[in-house]
Amino acid sequence: MAKKSLIYREKKRQKLEKKYHLIRRSSKKEISNIPSLSEKWKIHGKLQSPPRNSAPTRLHRRCFSTGRPRANYRDFGLSGHILREMVHACLLPGATRSSW
């Protein structure tokens, strides 16, 4: 189980990303439309003004049950070992074990 503080921090990052999403998108559009380099630098400074944690690259996908940030399956929202346990216990309908 992940620490509660890490899960809370990730939720805070998600809120910040939603809040500053439009500002980042509009700044990126402005940069691509302006040909002069000096104007691009000014807009680039505006792009750096939002907090670091509002950048979408800082977000992690976390396991729904444990909060684990690694080895997540997007389809289920679970980490690998929890997914395996749930499939073995027949808790995920439609998921089957494979053996070869």
Swiss-Prot record:
Q: Which GO terms describe its biological process?
A: translation
Q: Name the species this protein comes from.
A: Crucihimalaya wallichii
Localization (cell) = Plastid, Chloroplast
GO cellular component, alphabetical, reads: chloroplast; small ribosomal subunit
Protein name per its UniProtKB record: Small ribosomal subunit protein uS14c
| UniProt entry keywords in alphabetical sequence | Chloroplast, Plastid, Ribonucleoprotein, Ribosomal protein, RNA-binding, rRNA-binding
The protein's job, in short, is: Binds 16S rRNA, required for the assembly of 30S particles.
> Which Pfam family name is an example for this entry?
Ribosomal_S14
- Keyword check for rRNA processing: no
GO function terms (MF aspect):
rRNA binding; structural constituent of ribosome
The entry sums up its family as follows:
Belongs to the universal ribosomal protein uS14 family.
Q: Which InterPro entries match?
A: Ribosomal_uS14, Ribosomal_uS14_bac/plastid, Ribosomal_uS14_CS
- Note the SUPFAM superfamilies from the entry: Glucocorticoid receptor-like (DNA-binding domain)
Which PANTHER family does this chain map to? 30S RIBOSOMAL PROTEIN S14, SMALL RIBOSOMAL SUBUNIT PROTEIN US14M
Q: How does it assemble?
A: Part of the 30S ribosomal subunit.
Spell out the PROSITE patterns in the cross-references. Answer: RIBOSOMAL_S14
